[in-house]
Amino acid sequence: MPESLIAGIPVHFPFEPYPVQRAYMEKVIQCLKDGTNGVLESPTGTGKTLSLLCSSLAWIRTRQSEHQQQMIKLDKGADLLGGGAGGGPELSDLAKTMGKANNWGVPKVIYASRTHSQLTQAMRELKRTAYSNMRSVVLGSRDQLCIHPEVSREVGNSNKVNMCKLRVHSKTCTFQLRVESKKDHPDFRGPSIMDIEDLIKVGQKLKMCPYYASKELVPQADITFMPYNYLLDPKARKANKIELGNTIVILDEAHNIEKICEESASVQIKSSDVAIAIEDVTHIMKAFASDSPQDMAGDEPKDFTIDDLMLLKEMLLDLEKAIDAVAVDNPIDGATYPASMIYELLGKANFTYGNVATIVALLDKLVQYLMVASQQQMSLRKGGSFTLLSDLLTIVFANKESVMGKVHASFKVHVQVEESKQPQGKQAPAKQAGGWLSKASLTNGSTGKVAKIINFWCFNPGFGMEQLLNTQVRSVILTSGTLAPLKPLIAELAIPVAQHLENPHIVDQSQVYVKIIGTGPDRQPLISNYTNRDNPKYISSLGQTILNVSRLVPDGLLVFFPSYPMLNKCVDAWQASGLWADIASKKPIFLEPRGKDQFTSTMEEFYQAIRDSKGACFMAVCRGKVSEGLDFADRNGRAVIITGLPFPPLKDPKVILKRRYLESNRTRENQLLSGNEWYNLEATRAVNQAIGRVIRHRNDYGAILLCDSRFKDAAQVQQLSKWIRGHLGDRPQCSPFGPIVRELRQFFKNAETTMKQPDERESGAPLETVIKKEDEPLAPISQIKREPGSNATFKAANETAIKVEMANSIKSWSPDDYACAAGRKLGGSSAPNAMDFMSRLDSNVSSIDFNCMDSRNGSNSSGLVKIHKRERSSPPGSSQSSSQTAKKRYKLVENISTIKVEPPVEVKKEVPESRAAFLREIRSLVGQDQFRAFGQALLEYKDGSKDKFEALMKVVFEVLGGPRCRHLLVGMRKYIKADDKPEFDIRLAKLEKS
């Protein structure tokens, strides 16, 4: 493959990089060389994934070559540490740490994305590059990788995890036992790149557990692929033994990273969870007291005693009592308390920092015990309540006492009334009976206390990012097709960022038609605000608008509504008036199902209907699975209609508290959004995400129709994605409906004659699906093959609920694809950008239902901030693809855009306490030659005379004297000999004055 020198690093790229790709790779390499962080935006179709992989691995390969020489020099330097006088313990220890620098080795890459299908697609890209021989591994869940016939049949991810742990602990899993003997087998060690499917195939062939075997590859891997939650969730990071020191962390598809960080630190517990836990402890205690142990786990040895159970039950009863005592004056809105309340609540039940590790270990043992018992007694629960309690304790007490100030500022406790549930069978209330073998009532009816939900919510995404940075990572790179506005993103994440990039889109003006439609064909204003939602004239005019557009748009038409209630209201009205039948006569209509079971069949029917000359119309909801997780490239989505702004529920407690948090923490310096700005931006993020369904690669074309007059507001336009704003002009206006009809007809006429039409291979087929069980990590993807002339067939690995990803995914890059665009300024691969939701993190987190609408949830367009950004994840549905057709011709137009680089955000740094961290930070901030000179001068100074001090000062002030390293220069004083410190202070003072 051709080699390009980018930022001083030779990069093997499939072809001569285009300007957007070169600019992107330069920023990536600069981050890696300097050990700094970057926020890089490059729209879909610009070859982001390919550029990211090639640039990062090119730098790694260069460092590997340098490291061979570096290790030799460091080993020789270590020999100088054997003795000598002077320097004091600090200097001696620092020198010893310096001698161990070779242990840091070459940094490794961790590539994280939201879903396993996105990771699989990235690995497929990697297989086609010059770096396919570099060692890689993907970390998957037991749900995806387990091949044990009994464990894999368990329903629910937590059940599989606990059953697997039990079998491994008892040494009854033959697949896991074979890992040690088979881990060096050529079939396993041979391939450099193995994705989920490859691991399963090799595991089945060798009868070896793919889950545990994959972990054997991590220490030697140059790049490790994993989903976000493995990286950002402290529980998952600990469980998977992920070491982050001196690693390069790449967070792809990072436009929803703030929400993920917040949810990974949040947790919920219900009164009913505590009551069930009490009941489960009681069952186990009865088994201990019984003369017939076969009723539970038989004669298996127990890892706990009856005293452990008695103590735990007493603590749970106290916790139940403490929750009952929490005041909720307003049952509808709930009550909000400071973060300290959760620690006080748990403290009343004697859950403390001192004993939490012991309690969590006991809960895990009880879960495994019940897993065994449930195999013999099917009526028993499997310890789900213990898992929820363990999650609560793990997340709450993960925040060390030393950071309680930040916890109080970043978290809130919100208490809601839990809907009462009557337990099965007769049960005496625990507090009434009081005995050790009593059972807890789920409703606590005898006490008159209502059941409650305790939410421990994090509103500061920077809290999770700070924990990540504290692991001594070398660099963090956040990238996505839409990250802007960058400054508020960086401010919320609170990380130092040295490199910024906003790449332009690769499509030109002739490929996209964007208009704001302010009135319908009957001149009725189109505005989907709170006061207009029940207006029959507005609903009718909106339907007539969709009807007229459906006559003009070929193939697929997507219509997005602000919420499910609004969608249902329009459907009912149109069916009653006959508009529904009129639209359906032009294009068959498909509605986004809220249930998962119906989704696959609905999407399959839609893609089949696209092949008909009429095409099809799909009506969905912003933040639904169609808007967030699917790719409607080419014929599957030639136009998208946005019917309104999807504001979050105004009265949702989490929305209210998030706005309060921003208002109370916003300063001129930190550049946080105001509460109103965040609220309005949430709506536009969802719009940007929905718009992104149709323009998916550089040869795609389509129309974007914004059917709400509020989109003409200048502040609102500024929130739209950068490439959309370019089509609306400096002063966007609502266009009359008549001219729009003429322009839209002409746009598609021109596009169909000038643009190359995709063939079946490129566009709608085959489908790639992912079948998963509800609320579990995604299962491995398998490509669905379609014989010529036949419909796509769908393979399902499981039967329960279905999640479809990468539908209609863009074909992988080919040098020929780029060669045909020789006349263009910009180019790029059709980088796969399959969008789907990240499986819920292990913690039980309450999410906002952004599609909830009632009389209390109003919205308006005031206070809009002039920024734009793409949204994260949300509600039901997801999809699949089908086929595509016809022939196109290219009309290539040069598209020259300017790359916008924002100034760095200054973040004050502190001097690392430990010697290792001190040296590691120096190494991450300076070049190799400078670090080597610093180390040599330090070693000579340890045992040298006064002239060695002069030599050290010359090097230290040269290497650390710049603004980026000034804090390290100040920290260097600790390692200077006592006699030399006055002179060091004088020189430092002179530097500060200069």
Swiss-Prot record:
Residues noted as binding [4Fe-4S] cluster in the record, renumbered to the chain: C146, C164, C173, C209
EC class name: isomerase
Compositional bias per record (Low complexity), positions renumbered to this chain: 874-884
GO molecular function, one term: ATP binding
Alphabetical UniProt keywords: 4Fe-4S, ATP-binding, DNA damage, DNA repair, DNA-binding, Helicase, Hydrolase, Iron, Iron-sulfur, Isomerase, Metal-binding, Nucleotide-binding, Nucleus
Domain Helicase ATP-binding: 7-316
Recorded coiled-coil stretches: none
InterPro entries recorded: ATP-dep_Helicase_C, DinG/Rad3-like, Helic_SF1/SF2_ATP-bd_DinG/Rad3, Helicase-like_DEXD_c2, HHD_RTEL1, P-loop_NTPase, RAD3-like_helicase_DEAD, Rad3/Chl1-like
Motif (DEAH box): 252-255
Binding site for ATP: S42, P43, T44, G45, T46, G47, K48, T49
Function: A probable ATP-dependent DNA helicase implicated in DNA repair and the maintenance of genomic stability. Acts as an anti-recombinase to counteract toxic recombination and limit crossover during meiosis. Regulates meiotic recombination and crossover homeostasis by physically dissociating strand invasion events and thereby promotes noncrossover repair by meiotic synthesis dependent strand annealing (SDSA) as well as disassembly of D loop recombination intermediates.
PANTHER family associated with the record: DNA REPAIR DEAD HELICASE RAD3/XP-D SUBFAMILY MEMBER, REGULATOR OF TELOMERE ELONGATION HELICASE 1
UniProt name for this protein: Regulator of telomere elongation helicase 1 homolog
Biological source species: Drosophila ananassae (Fruit fly)
